[in-house]
């Protein structure tokens, strides 16, 4: 009970009447007292909740753990400051609440295989499958005690078994490997007394009811699941396990869908007919729908979906009323004489490392208190962005702040020019758990077709949760028109945008991705800033190159702030940040926990921390700013550096081994191509100076806040604690 008048209402009515006649001084006094009473009661209630691990505050978890003998893993790193958001997030990884809550139960189940899977999930947050490798050894059967399911030889006719070779689900016998699985050098797997914990670090994200992309270059019957038109492997929507003792199988883990399991093997098809899709995957992880003239979807039944290898688009042609699907590449082929007339909608799961770049995940939404929200979608009165902009323009009285919110994961193809009046605020954002795509087409032959934004004094523009492909985003000062040449800068003034925020968005590097994963326009920037002083903020986003053009270098440089993002210029030799002419950008850069692929040429770096620069960095003003706990390639010209690589290894290496050490600590990624699941993920062979080189011993780069080194160290320590005596247990990264 937190009512402000709780004490005043306890007074007899006669005193309240007298108090009202005198203007309510007694009521005001009791409201002040009630406020303090409420604070004390809430504190008492919070103290009671702190007695239980399920309801206690995060700072109480270590104390409850100490009461039951829980010991933190010091190899994972020291706890952070709980008063700061970064330290608070780190402490939740170092001392997981779920592990503390279940530690007594773990001790009772010590030595069981299923416990190792629970440990992986509760300690590190990674789904896992535990495997005992001695069961997969090939050996001679004893005549007295034959075990027909063990010790077999490899069956080269078993295509399904060979398809699983090397994975966590293989049943193919192996010869013995004498190397230990937890060796610090080269690891082995198949040995007596060896168990492995296969962990899946990539998270799966859903895409619901989005249009498939028609690849007209290959044929009007060829489609991709990805709305941008490139290959995307489909992933399993992991099903919960049925019991605590159950060992996870392929349906319980966020693993990529392979072609063989995607086919239904429970029922034999008629002679000469292919197998249709399995109920384990279709409808649950994947679905395809055809739309009618009115846009109403009709789902294709799984009996009409044929799993196929479509690495060659024209290799397989489905029969009439059927559709071929390749889950490995994310491709769809319809019969050539039965093409979709009104569109195709698909739902599927894809994988990525973290919640960045937009998608169907929860994120924090914000807007001004006075903002008016215009909802756009195929089922809404406003169908397009232009309809929403016109509704805002014609609104009487016109709101100073507007939010255009996309209510579905539709693809919007519009030509947009936004011009904000003084003090106006406009936000284009996706609704929660939606993934809209804005595809900018080549409408005009004589002019560029980027998403163009101008604004006057005090105006603000925000993008949140969108994927933009086909063209880039151009922010331009109000003093020049979009038709003007960049060779004729106007006089700087205050008549300009105040700030631009790009949050949880993807501005596709190279504008769009071809079917083979290569960018279509690798030399074109995703973000152009022409003659504007707007403060640009980029948060949890993926962008291509950034180009700027300044009015007059006698004024202050344009501020750009980048956090938890990827800036991808396609290769380390191209410019990730530079002027439109390829010279030094007149920019004051602040960057944290980000990965930059490409060269950076900027006027100043005020602060760069926990960041990977994959290309040479050139800063004009070296006497101002700092670069700390980052990777900066040799040959870079930066402000003073602190605890950066390869500077640290050069200081400690022998003179003859300097170059060897410099090459050793160079960041290695699993993939640097946008659209792949392991995009910008540090590889297992990457040097520890990079994977634990941040200021809190986490990894450098965009995935710093995942705290993967701390998760892995915690899990290794718990494996040593709960593995049966005489056995070796190790971690194997499945992706």
Regions found by a protein language model. Give the residues of each.
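Surface beta-loop-beta hairpin patches that serve as ligand-binding interfaces in beta-rich domains
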Residues: 339-362, 643-735
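Right-handed parallel beta-helix/beta-solenoid
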Residues: 355-394
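Right-handed parallel beta-helix/beta-spiral solenoid domain characteristic of secreted/periplasmic
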Residues: 422-488, 510-511, 515, 520
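Acidic/polar low-complexity surface segments
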Residues: 363-366, 439-448, 474-482, 507-532, ...
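C-terminal, active-site-flanking charged/polar segments
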Residues: 128, 324, 328-329, 336-354, ...
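Right-handed parallel beta-helix
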Residues: 460-465, 499-511, 533-547, 557-572, ...
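Compositionally biased, low-complexity/repeat regions
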Residues: 1-371
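N-terminal extracellular ligand-recognition/capping segment immediately after the signal peptide
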Residues: 100, 379-386, 390-447, 467
């Amino acid at each position: 009970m937190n009512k402000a008048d709780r004490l005043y209402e306890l007074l007899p009515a006669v005193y309240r009447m007298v108090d009202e006649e005198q203007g309510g001084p007694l009521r005001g006094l009791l409201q002040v007292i009630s406020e303090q009473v409420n604070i004390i009661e809430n504190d008492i209630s919070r103290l009671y909740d702190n007695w239980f691990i399920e309801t206690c505050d995060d700072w109480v978890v270590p104390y409850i753990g100490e009461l039951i003998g829980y010991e933190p893993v010091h190899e994972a790193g020291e706890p952070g400051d709980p008063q700061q958001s970064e330290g608070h997030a780190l402490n939740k990884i170092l001392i997981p609440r779920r592990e503390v809550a279940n530690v007594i139960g773990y001790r009772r189940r010590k030595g069981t295989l299923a416990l190792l899977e629970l440990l992986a999930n509760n300690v590190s947050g990674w789904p896992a499958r535990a495997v005992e490798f001695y069961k997969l050894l090939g050996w001679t059967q004893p005549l007295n005690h034959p075990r027909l399911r063990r010790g077999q030889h490899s069956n080269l006719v078993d295509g399904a078994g060979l398809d699983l070779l090397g994975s966590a689900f293989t049943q193919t016998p192996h010869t013995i490997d004498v190397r230990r699985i937890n060796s610090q050098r080269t690891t082995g797997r198949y040995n007596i007394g060896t168990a492995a914990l296969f962990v899946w670090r990539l998270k799966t994200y859903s895409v619901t009811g989005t249009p498939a992309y028609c690849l007209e270059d290959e044929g009007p019957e060829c489609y991709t699941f990805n709305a941008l038109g490139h290959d995307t492997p489909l992933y399993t929507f992991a099903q919960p396990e049925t019991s605590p003792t159950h060992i996870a199988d392929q349906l319980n883990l966020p693993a990529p869908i392979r072609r063989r399991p995607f086919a239904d093997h429970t029922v034999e098809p008629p002679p000469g007919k292919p197998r249709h899709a399995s109920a384990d995957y279709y409808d649950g992880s994947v679905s395809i729908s055809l739309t009618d003239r009115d846009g109403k979807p009709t789902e294709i039944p799984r009996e009409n979906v044929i799993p196929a290898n479509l690495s060659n688009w024209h290799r397989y042609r489905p029969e009439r009323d059927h559709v071929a699907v390749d889950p490995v590449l994310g491709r769809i082929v319809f019969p050539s004489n039965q093409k979709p007339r009104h569109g195709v909608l698909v739902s599927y799961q894809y994988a990525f490392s973290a919640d960045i770049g937009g998608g169907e995940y929860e994120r924090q939404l914000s807007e001004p208190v006075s903002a008016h929200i215009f909802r756009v979608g195929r089922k809404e009165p406003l169908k397009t962005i232009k309809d929403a902009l016109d509704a805002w323009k014609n609104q009487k009285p016109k709101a100073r702040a507007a939010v255009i919110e996309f209510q579905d994961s539709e693809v919007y193809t519009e030509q947009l020019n936004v011009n904000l009046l003084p003090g106006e605020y406009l936000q284009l954002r996706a609704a929660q758990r939606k993934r809209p795509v804005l595809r900018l087409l080549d409408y005009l032959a004589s002019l560029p077709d980027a998403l163009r934004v101008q604004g006057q004094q005090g105006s603000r523009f925000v993008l949140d949760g969108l994927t933009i492909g086909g063209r880039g985003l151009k922010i331009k000062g109000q003093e020049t028109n979009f038709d003007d040449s960049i060779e004729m800068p106007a006089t700087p003034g205050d008549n300009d945008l105040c700030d631009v925020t790009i949050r949880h968005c993807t501005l596709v590097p190279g504008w769009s991705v071809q079917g083979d994963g290569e960018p279509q326009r690798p030399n074109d920037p995703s973000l152009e800033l022409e003659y504007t002083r707007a403060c640009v903020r980029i948060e949890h986003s993926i962008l291509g190159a950034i180009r700027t053009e300044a009015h007059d270098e006698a004024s202050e440089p344009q501020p750009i702030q980048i956090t938890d993002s990827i800036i991808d210029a396609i290769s380390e030799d191209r410019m990730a940040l530079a002027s439109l002419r390829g010279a030094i950008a007149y920019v004051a850069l602040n960057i944290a926990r980000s990965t930059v692929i490409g060269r950076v040429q900027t006027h100043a770096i005020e602060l760069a921390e926990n960041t990977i620069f994959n290309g040479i960095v050139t800063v004009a003003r070296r006497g101002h700013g700092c670069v700390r706990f980052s990777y900066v390639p040799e040959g870079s010209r930066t402000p003073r550096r602190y605890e950066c690589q390869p500077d640290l290894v050069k200081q400690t290496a022998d003179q003859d081994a300097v170059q060897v050490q410099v090459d050793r600590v160079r960041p290695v990624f699993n993939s640097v191509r946008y659209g792949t699941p392991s995009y910008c993920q540090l590889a297992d062979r990457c040097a520890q100076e990079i994977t634990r080189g941040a200021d809190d011993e986490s990894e450098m780069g965009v995935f710093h806040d995942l705290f993967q080194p701390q998760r892995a160290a915690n899990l290794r320590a718990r494996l040593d604690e709960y593995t049966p005596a005489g056995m070796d247990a190790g971690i194997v990264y499945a992706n």
